[in-house]
Amino acid sequence: MNGHFFISKLYDIMTCKKEYKNMKLQLTLNSLALILCCGDLIPSSTQPISTQEWQGIEKKLKSVHKEPSMITGMSIDTLTQIIGLDEFTAHKIEKRQKLLPDLFYALQNLENQDIGVTTIYEEDYPASLRVLGTKMPLVISYIGDLSLSYGVNISVAGPQMMNKTMRHVTKEIMKKISKEGYTVVVGGSKGVEELALRTQLTNNGNAVLFVADHMFDKIRLYSKYIKQNKLVIMTANDPYALFDVTHALDKNLYICGMVFAQIVTGTHIGSGPVWFTSIQNIHSHWTRQLVYETLDYSGNIRLIEMGEAHFTDEDLKSEVTLAEILDNHETVIKKDDPSIDQMTIFEFIEETHE
């Protein structure tokens, strides 16, 4: 496949402005090359290039002053001898090149269903995700007004099984969030996240639903709010994807990157995604965490012991803002404090369930 053929084909997919109604995809050549090589939009037995592999390819291309788009029209000899890629990677790229017609079909199909696509090479890619560095998703599919994700965001996470107290706490948190004008970012799990999302939308607030699977089910469920430009649904995976535990955990990481703070209403030690993400967040410093002070959840107790900011029922009733609560209740943990590493080794594997 030569470069002229690739560019002429890419031109066919580049159209006008993105909008929810009659979505028209507008993607740069670099983005299309990235989606072709790394995206999972194309059903194929040919494995996509991993994020880590792509980052290595980018470095090689930059060293010889080449754009990512040029890689798709290169032969194996050019990829190995001029770009400096190894034979294995070059052959993977060659196999992906042959999927170009399938890519156009997949993008056209998404466009017909008002699904937009953006990548790290596009100006509309959410800037907040770039704080994740090498862990940020390369490709995002979405429906709705993507600019909803550009504001000051906050996430709410907690157990999927709620008791009366947890339901009350979540509703009180949402009152503060609504009053302070934040955009809520959630992952769509049942329980606390679902309640937070529905409450935010009912209160006419803005929301981002970042999912890892079953995107079209969520679109049907929340189509009213998408049309009202109050909700954008996003995914870093194929919109048709089914549940995958790795994708689910990655999605939680992306949510952390998008928000200035994550509110944890309840989690037990070693219990699941909320606990696992909270611990990862402590290690990686993706965002600040605000944990509900309660004796009912072992994970909450441990997170607060480890220095995470906490809030009480009195805080929820007060006029103090969430940002002020974060500042007032945050503890600084010394770098040589061994408790974090000890916890992840011994406590994370406990079989407590939310």
PLM-predicted stretches and their roles:
Residues 1-22:
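N-terminal amphipathic/basic-hydrophobic helices that include classical n-h-c signal peptides
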Residues 4-5, 53, 87, 310, ...:
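Intrinsic disorder/low-structure terminal segments
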Residues 15-121:
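Short, small/acidic-rich helices and loops at N termini and domain boundaries
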Residues 16-48, 74-75, 113, 119-354:
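Glycine-biased, small-residue-rich flexible motifs in mid-sequence functional cores and linkers
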